[in-house]
Regions:
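Active-site-adjacent substrate/metal-binding segments within catalytic domains
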Residues: 30-116
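Active-site-adjacent "subsite" loops/lids of carbohydrate-active enzymes
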Residues: 75-76, 80-81, 126-153, 193-201
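Aromatic-lined substrate-binding rim segments of carbohydrate-active enzymes
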Residues: 81-140, 205-208, 212-231, 280
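Aromatic-lined carbohydrate-recognition surfaces of secreted/lumenal glycan-active proteins
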Residues: 165, 199-241, 288-303, 339-349
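Glycoside hydrolase catalytic-domain groove-lining segments
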Residues: 224-227, 238-313, 331-335, 341
Length: 400
């Protein structure tokens, strides 16, 4: 579409948007959850109908713009606003029903609202390498950030009903930080808040997540009269040292190449025989009465990494075709797992040139595996950048 058309749509947006095994323990006099999203043993429900998450991770980190610097901006460059709007339209056109946001400026929610018929998962980004999550300063800054993100969402969805699937309280906290926090606070083994009460054998890191989740729910309810589902995104390296069944559902970031490296003794999948399917089945079996959402899966096509190929593929070194076939294999593994899963989010929509800061963001490093996970690539056009679909975009569109 033409830039002028996007600008008119953006003007419309801006003129219509204003300024452990115990679950949530809502007090007896507290109203019922106002969210349209709920859960059963296996699925997330939207308006009491099973809702299979078909998601994509989206970070609007275009060259020269860092996500953590534009997050608070309310006056993004017009070229970036056009690109964000175009990206969200294309994500919807691909067949996705959910975008997983983190570091999202207000305009992302405005664009999602005007595109319509799309949902989102909101990540609360916690300093994952903090040496002590029980540090009062870490708690205070995390709570401040929770307020900022929730306020930003409701400044757009001021009718009080954002299409918010869940708030993710943290993503992949580091193993060293978890272990150091737990070692420093052996006396912390329980949390009791306004909405979350855990059992008495949790760790200090788990108590931190419970406290932040309780705060998010309390702030959202008391400020906006809405209560969203809450989760935490774990990963394979920390699967044995952090567990949060006191949240609404279980989330894991799961990558096919990581399983043979970190869990080589994982049983083969019951249907496809892959280690990836075996791993997600193991995760689900740990909490068979709670939904399991795969909040990230993806493959990097970084050119200078070693090539591995199917069925596990590699951490980088994949061809564009292998990225497409590998992602479809992951979706098939999820779809045919022994117990139903709640869905998946593909990591990620755009290549992330920005991973190592502003100077790095102007070019794509062939040696940096993390910069090449996108299902679309960035191409310079004049003084800005356009996107070009990779094979995986069309493959996902046909699958979904």
């Amino acid at each position: 579409m033409k830039s002028k058309f996007f600008s008119l749509l953006i003007l419309l947006i801006l003129t219509t948007s204003c300024g452990k095994n115990e679950h949530f323990n809502d007090r007896d006099n507290d109203p019922v959850n106002t969210s349209s999203f709920h859960v059963n043993n296996h699925q997330i429900l939207k308006n009491n109908i099973p809702f299979q998450v078909k998601g994509v991770v989206y970070v609007p980190g275009y060259p020269g713009l860092l996500p953590w610097e534009i997050e608070n901006s309310t006056s993004l460059p017009i070229a970036l606003r056009n690109s964000i709007f175009n990206d969200i339209q294309n994500i919807k056109a691909m067949g996705a029903n959910t975008i997983r946001f983190w570091g999202a400026p207000k305009f992302c929610y405005e664009a999602l609202k005007i595109v319509g018929d799309m949902n989102f998962i909101q990540v609360i980004w916690i300093q994952g390498d903090a040496p002590d999550f029980q540090n009062p300063e870490i708690k205070s800054s995390t709570k401040e950030y929770i307020r900022e993100v929730i306020d930003r969402i409701y400044s757009v969805f001021h009718d009080g009903s954002p299409p918010l699937v869940a708030i993710t309280i943290g993503n992949e906290l580091s193993e060293s930080s978890i272990l150091s926090t737990d070692a420093a606070h052996p006396e912390v083994h329980h949390f009791s808040g306004d909405y979350i009460v855990t059992d008495s054998n949790i760790t200090a890191t788990e108590a931190f997540i419970a406290e932040m989740a309780d705060y998010a729910r309390s702030y959202e309810w008391t400020t906006y009269g809405h209560k969203s589902l809450l989760t935490y995104s774990n990963e394979i390296r920390t699967a044995d040292i952090i567990d949060v069944p006191f949240l609404d559902f279980i989330s894991h970031n799961a990558y096919s190449y990581a399983v043979p490296y970190y869990r080589p003794n994982t049983a083969s999948g019951s249907s496809s025989g892959t280690l990836f399917q075996g791993w997600i089945e193991e995760l689900k079996s740990n909490h068979p009465d709670q939904p399991l959402l795969i909040t990230e899966t993806g493959l990097s096509i970084s050119p200078n990494a070693s090539h591995v190929g199917p069925p596990n593929y590699g951490y980088g070194g994949n061809t564009e075709l292998e990225q497409a076939t590998g992602l479809l294999q992951n979706l098939h593994d999820i779809q045919t797992a022994a117990l139903p899963l709640a869905g998946v989010c593909i990591h990620e929509y755009l290549d992330s040139w920005w991973k190592f800061g502003l100077e790095d963001s102007y070019s794509q490093d062939p040696n940096d595996i993390e910069e090449w996970f996108g299902i679309v690539k960035l191409k310079q056009q004049g003084d800005w950048y356009i996107t070009e679909f990779r094979s995986s975009y069309d493959s996902l569109k046909n699958y979904w």
